[in-house]
Design a protein with these regions (language model features):
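S-adenosylmethionine/decaboxylated-SAM
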Residues: 3-8, 12-122
Length: 122
């Protein structure tokens, strides 16, 4: 589990992803495949830490209700119980879920049309 959600990743992969996110410092992470949502929660929590680090370095106050970074999860079949659990999680403000195929041109266009700022329309 990662923060209460099952995660389907090897520990070594989790460490590698964390190192990559720290180095790249992305504003948006797009994940294909949601399953139970553990990886979405992992990515959202790592982005939350980046926001905290940025605020600390800048000497500004961080408002957790206004995240600067977000995660978008795309899955062809988001199970209702998994969607509900992800939407109820404290990291939900950082997560947007899109149901559809990640190779569908309409889904790709929707992703590209979204603003980079975090959304709360899980």
């Amino acid at each position: 589990d990662w923060m209460g959600r099952p995660i389907i990743q090897y520990p070594e992969d989790i460490m590698s992803v964390q190192e990559l996110i720290w180095e790249v410092r992305p504003d948006v992470i797009v994940e294909t495949g949601i399953a139970h949502g553990g990886s979405l929660i992992l990515s959202a929590s790592l982005l939350a830490m980046l926001d905290l680090c940025d605020a600390t370095e800048a000497g500004t106050v961080l408002d957790p209700a206004q995240p600067k970074r977000r995660v978008v999860g795309v899955d062809i079949d988001i199970r209702p119980h998994n969607r509900a659990a992800i939407e109820a999680h404290p990291m939900a403000k950082r997560i947007t879920m899109i149901q559809g195929s990640s190779i569908d041109p309409a889904i790709v266009a929707e992703l590209l049309a979204r603003p980079l700022a975090a959304e709360s329309d899980s």
